[in-house]
């Protein structure tokens, strides 16, 4: 975890867990591959495209700002 604040992946995981859904369910809701969600949450893809983040935000029912804030 960054000392500066939460990463996009950490924020995605936080909101996903609040909803009580798995990475698989989120990937289907966002129409993305499972490994895309897994890699972002794990930090292996620290800078996903804005389109990917928009899809995830919509699937989680949160704003883009909620996911990119630190």
Language model: regions and residue ranges:
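Alpha-helical residues within the helix-turn-helix
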Residues: 17, 28, 58
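Short, Lys/Arg-enriched C-terminal cap helix and immediately downstream tail that follows
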Residues: 15, 49-50
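DNA major-groove recognition helix of helix-turn-helix/homeodomain DNA-binding modules
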Residues: 51-66
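A short, Lys/Arg-rich alpha-helix, primarily the initiator
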Residues: 1-18
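Alpha-helical DNA-recognition elements
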Residues: 39, 43, 55
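Short alpha-helical DNA-recognition segment
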Residues: 21-40
